[in-house]
A protein has these predicted regions:
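Juxtamembrane "helix-exit" motif on the non-cytosolic side of transmembrane helices
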Residues: 2-10, 68-79, 128-140, 192-203
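N-terminal topogenic module of multi-pass integral membrane proteins
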Residues: 1-86
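Membrane-interface helix-boundary motifs at transmembrane edges
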Residues: 42-51, 104-115, 165-175
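Canonical alpha-helical transmembrane segments
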Residues: 27-45, 97-106, 155-164
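C-terminal transmembrane-bundle signature of multipass membrane proteins
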Residues: 1-2, 23-24, 30-34, 144-239
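Transmembrane helix-loop junctions in multipass membrane proteins, especially transporters and channels
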Residues: 41-45, 74-78, 107-108, 135-136, ...
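Alpha-helical transmembrane segments of multi-pass integral membrane proteins
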Residues: 55-71, 87-101, 115-131, 147-158, ...
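Transmembrane alpha-helix entry/boundary detector in multi-pass membrane proteins
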Residues: 12-23, 80-91, 112-117, 132-152, ...
Length: 239
């Protein structure tokens, strides 16, 4: 399933791996949605889906994607300490679980706890640090600057959007969140959609692994859902 590009040292996967990830995410997401539907039909006090339903579904799908991401990650270079590798994997899985919980809360229009939103932010801090350590020298960083910039945009979006989702935006938070949201939407789209197409059609001249491509794809969907669901909140002027 996994192959290595010897000229660059980067890993890439064929379309079978991509299809497998999509299959797992789709199955789990459908099961979760069916479970919600069953609970809503019973006499359980769960509010019906509100305008945040799309946001909740996108969070659940992103959460499932993050939770299973370590299963498809290739060996991280020896330049990254083993302890940091372990922390990255644990945080990614926990962040995935957090997003699933957040998705359920948004689906039923409940305000999430701020702690649930801190974990995904921390996972991207570690992800960014590991990405820096994976590349040796400034030339390696420069040649993959698009991936690093993308992670920075997503990290900024996760940090500032957490305040919006908790309903406690500070001064200028809305404008900053809106800026990072649009930057993240553009960068994740660039890092996912073209690479996804080339991966499926067997193009091996790509440097992003399939786990990174798919994570960016579902992050794109999440950011898009956030912009739609929270449009009023992030465009209001703080008096």
């Amino acid at each position: 399933m996994f192959m290595t590009d010897g000229s660059t040292g980067f890993y890439y996967e064929n379309y079978e791996s991509t299809s497998l990830v999509f299959t797992i995410i789709t199955i789990v997401s459908v099961v979760l949605m069916v479970a919600l539907s069953i609970l809503n039909k019973q006499n359980i006090k769960i509010a019906p889906p509100k305008p945040n339903a799309f946001l909740g579904i996108s969070q659940i799908m992103l959460g499932v994607c993050l939770a299973i991401e370590p299963l498809f990650v290739n060996d991280i270079p020896s330049t990254v300490p083993n302890a940091l590798k372990t922390i990255k994997v644990v945080l990614i899985v926990v962040a995935g679980i957090s997003f699933v919980v957040l998705g359920f809360l948004n689906f039923i229009d409940k305000t999430p706890n701020y702690i649930l939103l801190i974990i995904p932010t921390l996972s991207y801090v570690i992800r960014l640090l590991v990405t820096f350590l994976c590349y040796t020298g400034m030339s390696g960083i420069a040649s993959n600057i698009y991936e690093i910039v993308n992670l920075c945009f997503v990290l900024g979006f996760l940090h500032f959007s957490s305040k919006i989702l908790c309903g406690v935006p500070g001064k200028n938070t809305k404008a900053i969140t809106r800026t990072f949201a649009y930057l993240s939407l553009i960068s994740t789209s660039i890092c996912s959609i073209p690479n996804m197409i080339t991966t499926i059609f067997g193009n091996t001249n790509i440097h992003l692994s399939v786990d990174s491509i798919i994570t960016n794809l579902f992050m794109t969907i999440y950011v898009f859902a956030f912009l739609i669901s929270k449009k009023q909140e992030i465009e209001e002027t703080i008096e």
